[in-house]
Amino acid sequence: MVNQSSTPGFLLLGFSEHPGLERTLFVVVLTSYLLTLVGNTLIILLSALDPKLHSPMYFFLSNLSFLDLCFTTSCVPQMLVNLWGPKKTISFLDCSVQIFIFLSLGTTECILLTVMAFDRYVAVCQPLHYATIIHPRLCWQLASVAWVIGLVESVVQTPSTLHLPFCPDRQVDDFVCEVPALIRLSCEDTSYNEIQVAVASVFILVVPLSLILVSYGAITWAVLRINSAKGRRKAFGTCSSHLTVVTLFYSSVIAVYLQPKNPYAQERGKFFGLFYAVGTPSLNPLIYTLRNKEVTRAFRRLLGKEMGLTQS
């Protein structure tokens, strides 16, 4: 095994062969990051400060917003430095931290999105028992389970990836330190790591996504049985935002972690990795707020209070 502590780190290639594209991506990534900071911070503040948003749905949403803030902050600053300047290296320690955070928070988001689907299932299919089933204690327990599973997954998979003997050039064909990219960088047999990724993908991607699809199948069946068109629109409206987020997140993560072994898929995987690391966290607040009248009204109430305090 190579002594990784004595190595200078890795070279993140990204799109270094296209300098013009890197400048464009710098603007896109910076804009997305600023939107992520503002949008997700606003959702957390509204969920905490507005009593009308003190419900399980917004508790889970604020968890998702906090998770997205941490997720993007773990990689975007380094990514911006690499996109803007000639220096595209990352130290072994920074790469290790980045992988650990990526795995932990990515896994947590997979589980949390499943929990949110369960919350919507109970709200639509068992409305009379919703308050009894989804009580505050259960909310905290489910959120804690999501975070713990993410931590355990990262503790298990990060060391086995970082202890691989890497090729001397240490050129990572990606924007960030991702597990698939580092496995491809190894000069020796990586069958164990590939099996580990495949097994983890089943439990973290396939199983949660299947549960989400089952939940939304039951939700769709229940909504179609509602007699009034207004009731159907309201029920679908509360679930469409979450389903959109699930589609964007899972499609991009699956494209990165379950991609076939060919150069085209790997090149495409870089774009998908960039999208789920930067794009989805910036879009989530917009998706959840644009069609959500409760959040819009909460923002107006908060803005009205601030205006009143300023005038007084």
UniProtKB/Swiss-Prot annotation:
Record localization: Cell membrane
What are the GO BP annotations of this UniProt entry? defense response; detection of chemical stimulus involved in sensory perception of smell; mating
Matching InterPro entries: GPCR_Rhodpsn, GPCR_Rhodpsn_7TM, Olfact_rcpt
Instruction: Respond yes or no to whether keyword Glycosyltransferase is given for this record.
Output: no
| Side Extracellular, residues | 1-23, 78-98, 157-193, 258-270
Look up keyword Amino-acid biosynthesis and say if it applies: no
CDD domains found in the cross-reference section:
7tmA_OR2B-like
**Organism's domain of life?**
Eukaryota
Gene Ontology cellular component terms for the protein in this record: plasma membrane
Pfam hit, one:
7tm_4
Q: Which residues lie on this side of the membrane: Cytoplasmic?
A: 48-55, 119-137, 218-234, 291-312
How is this protein named in the record?
Olfactory receptor 2H2
- Name the encoding gene, please: OR2H2
